[in-house]
Amino acid sequence: MTNPKMFDLSGKVAVVTGGSRGIGRSICEQMAAHGAKVVVSSRKLPACEEVVKGIKEKGGEATAVAASISEKAQLENLVAVARKTYCRIDIMVCNAASNPYFGPLTGLKEEVFQKIMQNNVMSNLWLMNMVGPEMAERKDGAFIIVSSIGALMGSAHIAAYCMSKAADLSLVKSLAMEWGKHNIRINAIAPGLIQTDFAKALWDNPDIRKANESKAALKRIGQPDDIGGVAVFLASKAGAFVCGQCIIADGGVIGAGAE
């Protein structure tokens, strides 16, 4: 029998890091549109509040909390405020990431690499350990890490970022083994090139963009909403049997292979 509410998130509370723009903003908006109460988080509160305003104007419910993924105490506060506001956390989306270096590995400074790994990997482990016990107690939860197809290939421009995203995929598999027995579904999304401010150095480069579009089966780069829908799937009943996986949403770059 068809279940018309397979993607319904009514009654659920979702916390989204990096939620003020790009992919994160789309995830916030899409989850709110499907009924979730959303905690929009990023470093800058005004940007989060703008997203919240848009959600509320469309009849959704959301609140803004400023937090930097580089500071564990700020993430602890994010989780605490979310619980104080909505009494629970059902969905945790780790979308925020940093990539302060664009260039060859020969020029990568050690402290920059350490920052990338802490922000893009360690922060996700912190958040899982913060929200996991509550989800385990309820025997229900969804934990989503936004990775990248860069995790699955090499890069001459953003190798350190790609390494961190590969580590996230390994983290997802290990967390799934640890928390899956509590009915917590832990998965990753690996977007291809998406037209966001974060990836502007790539899509705004005519040569890189043309190369990406020529490789993609769909012959285009992605938009934030192309990823927001995947997150809704993983957070909803539609994704109830998906755990420890990475969903590639890249327009067919990897799947199409070389021509």
Regions found by a protein language model. Name each.
Residues 86, 125, 140, 220-249, ...:
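C-terminal substrate-recognition "lid" of short-chain dehydrogenase/reductases
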Residues 133, 177-181, 240:
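Alpha-helical segment proximal to the catalytic Tyr-Lys
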Residues 128, 164, 172:
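Active-site helix of classical SDR
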Residues 13, 20-21, 44:
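Conserved glycine-rich cofactor-binding loop
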Residues 148:
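Residue(s) in the substrate-gating loop at a strand-loop-helix junction
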Residues 2-5, 102, 153, 232, ...:
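Short C-terminal tail/terminal secondary-structure segment
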Residues 103-105, 109-114, 212:
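Substrate-binding pocket helix/loop in short-chain dehydrogenase/reductase
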